[in-house]
Amino acid sequence: MATGFNPYRRQAVHWRAGWDIGLLAYRNQGRNVLILCPEKEQIAGAGMVLGLFGKKTDHPLAEMKSAQALLDDIPKGDSLRALQEISDWVETLREQADDFRVDHQWEVLCPYDQAAQAPVRKLLHDYFAPQAPSQFQENRLWTLLDEYYTRSELCHFDVLTRYRDGAKGAASIKEDIPLLCARGIHAITGRLKMAAARYAMVDPALWRRLAAFYTLAESHDCLETPLTLYAGTNTTVAQSFATLVLWYGSSAGNLSPLQEHIAERLFAALGSRAAISRSYDGAGLFAFDLAQPTPPMRATAGATVHPALRFVAADGQRQRLADLLKNLDKGILPEGLNFYGAKYEVEQVREVAQRLWQSLTLPPPTRRTPRRKIKVNLKVANGFSKMLERSDVGLSFGAEESEVWEIEDISATGFRSVIPMGRANGIRIASLLGSQPDGVSHWGAGVVRRLSRDLDGNLHIGIELLSPRIVGVPLLDYANPDESGVQIGMYLNRPNDNSGEAWLLMKQDAFVANRSLKMELGDKEYLLLPLALVEQGEDTTWRAIA
């Protein structure tokens, strides 16, 4: 045998004959061979594979020595390949779990899940980079991360189910129940994050499994048992559960994917100061129903309280978040924040922290204006350029025909629309949106604040109204009024704003804090002194001008 040869090194083979048979390891003259089966021979080939691994002792994961050898042979320098291989083995461990005692299944799962964390962190770093990856790379990274989190979560839940059912070896893993439940909750957090990255519908069964992990730990009186989740990460089941509930309840559907990631990392850094209780005492922010699990909901005094409800308060997190904001306001990014090596701008982190602090404030924010049901069609234009084409600036860009949406409900400050996913190309949190209701001659401006997907695959879009009317205006640098440097912006007509400020929409990165502008509006000229950058999107900047 060749020096250094690992007889258990494998290549992934997925036999598709209505099911996945799993992974096949084969040794041939001291080399590793990838065996592929033609489609017409898949069923016969499936029988051959089952025969090969029919006995537990024949399976490469059946003994810890061979399982560890496989793990040691996974390439450490290639994060994509490493995670794919670990993911495949974790899937095999679940699919063929009946071949193993549950304590052996858990013994193998632990080091494989630990080994996956390094490539997972690397891929998260690349996926949530300050500069978005290419579409190809985004899809590749998302698929691998989502696949691993899914397989890991399902395998941990399979161990839980077999333990709960009293499978052989169950008694041997009783002491590891806190770690099992915490890692299961960690994998669920990852699945939720990847769903948020695509504004995808969350599988309702995920909430039931979250309830199962928490309930098992609670029944074993180990919610507060200190544990090492992974190397360098200490937590408890209660902390993992509370962090997930606070993060998801505060950010789901109203932050961009990158902001959701930053928010999850901030909550992870806030520590173990969340409190979980069985009764509502006015301090609980979110409630989770263990009997009929659904996404975390805002806790209210008037809600029906029953024994299966768990309330999560965030007094400690709120104070630590306030302390963090003081540093961020000074331009200081604390070293304790773990963004997996990504370098985010302080202002980027501060914006997310500020929104989280607002969401954790008691009493919770209430709707400022009443919302009423209505069915009205309106034309929409997504993005600064398309809105500019439809403004009255007097320029013709050959605007294409506008998309038409139907409003479901409306208020003085915004509206909600439900559209098929296929008609929502380019729509995301913080997208700038032009709108023109039927029968109205001018266009207004809004920004997407909430996105969620329903069971039918439709996208629910919540839009905050910035202005009922936009006016295209030419803008010149007041210090250098050369007409060759003219840029076009959009003036937001805000009828009820008596602040004396003018609000403009401009191209991204057009705001300069020390540059005054000359604006022509109607037959008048105005000197605009920069006041503040209100918000910046992918293709536009909001600017408040005195």
Language-model features: where?
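Generic hydrophobic, helix-prone segments enriched in Leu/Val/Ile
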Residues: Y8, A12, R16-A17, N32, ...
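Short strand-loop-strand
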Residues: F339, K343-H442, R450-D456, H460-I470, ...
